[in-house]
């Protein structure tokens, strides 16, 4: 090999060669990044969709918003600036129109519903044998087996269990109100109730939160699980480094999940030992197993989904609703008037009668619009050949989603969107132009929430009985409770402190 010229050899040994290689590497890196930026901004199949350039070239902005629990606010701000469809990452579009719901989540014109985005529904998130992760055929089979547990008839059969847990809540709160002690944290007490209720219906026994006035460890696990889910959603955005990034997550989070799985199995096995029929969710799964529709393993795997889906989100919705009621006196007064005009005594409030309360239903609807518990939605992915969403052709392999918060707070969809106004659901002409078809808090299509009626009915019962028995006063320190709560799958709510006064016998005069 011919020797380097003397001046080059001198340059190399003086360190110039190393510096030259460093410069070459830097230039190559800048060239590669520049090529990626140019492609994603001007040549990518999604380059024609509006959105900030920083989101077009990288997933970092949306990932950072997710990590801070601010993704709902971030995406909402983009829609206010760019319109009804926004490119929020290189391969992801967010929609806020009513028409997009069916295009994304429902079967349409012979085609199946769009597949779930595997960045979001990744294999590290939930057990693959659960209804959440199942493919379309398996999902349909499991859902058919679970559906009888959530039918109107089944709910009436489950009412004694539901009423018993709510009565325990009311009795515990009444004891606190009568003691003249410390303020009551409604966030905690609603959490106790929904976890005990779901535990009772899923496992045949409550978690004992109400009885002991303390959180069961499972309550904290669910919050940890939601935060871990957010971390996994973020790291899976950065393929092919997702596995490496996931390995950097605290091992304690993985250990907590294993402990949860073990506890679930123990409780399911204990429920299976119960002799005779019991009117709860598990009984219907057992019936399906006996009929050969589900395997015993599939029965076990669905139990944890029931806890994750049915407890925390209902508690979050309840707490939002009572806060919004307590900070809007006309709403509180009208709810009390409706209760007084409908019932003579608390015992009349049941699953059938509570559904006569039209204003209460409107209050819950408006609370779900104003503060949707699952605010960021569940993304899907278009097939390789592409799909039409909201009248627009969307290229293949594009992640598409409807962000509940952004859709429900958009002036494109609702009149006075930043105001809590239950009248919008009662035919008030001020809201005739509202795009109410965009309001889908339980989603649509074959994977919509199977427990929708259970959630509505349990919230109505709890709120009606609570307002029948108590006169709550929000503490000053909780006046700004709503501001800037972070969301990791669902919202992480701080304590909601109130003083409780037991209503006297004259609070609801006997009807003529």
From Swiss-Prot:
Transmembrane segments: 19-39
Consequences of knocking out this gene: Leads to the loss of intermediates such as confertifolin.
EC number: 1.-.-.-
Extent of the signal sequence: none
CC per GO annotation: membrane
Family: Belongs to the cytochrome P450 family.
This protein's name: Cytochrome P450 monooxygenase astD
Species the sequence originates in: Aspergillus oryzae (strain ATCC 42149 / RIB 40)
Gene from which the chain derives: astD
